[in-house]
Design a protein with these regions (language model features):
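HIT superfamily nucleotide-processing domains
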Residues: 1-173
């Protein structure tokens, strides 16, 4: 299930119109209609007691991951101090693994929540030749996709994900 804006095509699984206010409420648990409460949000790399890391499988961006908080929370400040630290440790761990295994030109981190108001962080390895670089993944396309580069990055993801799972501290998430 793709819940982030698909470049140029909109969003495939948004809640019904008018439901965003209800989805944005703090309080944990699960919220009906929230795609991250009702589904994984992508291919699960690992899932812990507090959060999961998924591979978002966004076309043109083979190394697009999300760190998704398990309980429904709309804002980072809805978490207590210990959970905020834990969440950022997970974001940092994903970023470090992407850097170590893929050597991207840049890592993009984003926590918007405007489309899906369930706390999640986008962690995206970016390469100078990608279709939108140096703009954000949601910016207009600047060039054609380099199929060879996309395939080369995608081929390295399984090893990177195994390393992510083996990283010390992963089990605490």
């Amino acid at each position: 299930m793709n819940v982030a804006p698909t470049l140029g095509t909109g969003v495939s699984s948004l809640p019904p119109e008018g439901a965003l206010a209800a989805l944005g409420r703090p309080g944990g648990g699960s919220v009906q209609g929230c795609p991250f409460c009702e589904g994984s949000g992508g291919r699960v790399v690992f899932e812990g007691a507090k959060l999961r890391v998924i591979h978002a499988e966004e076309a043109g961006f083979p190394a697009f991951y999300r760190v998704i908080w398990r309980e429904h929370a709309a804002e980072f400040s809805d978490l207590d101090a210990a959970d905020r630290v834990l969440c950022m440790e997970a974001v940092t761990m994903v970023e470090q693994c992407l850097r170590e295994h893929l050597s991207p030109d840049k890592i993009n981190l984003a926590a918007l929540g405007n489309m899906v108001p369930h706390l999640h962080w986008h962690v995206i390895a970016r390469f100078a030749g990608d279709t939108h670089f140096p703009g954000s993944v949601w910016a207009p396309v600047q060039r054609e996709a380099d199929a060879e580069q996309l395939a080369a990055v995608a081929a390295r993801l399984p090893e990177m994900e195994r390393a992510m799972m083996a990283r010390p501290g992963t089990r605490s998430f």
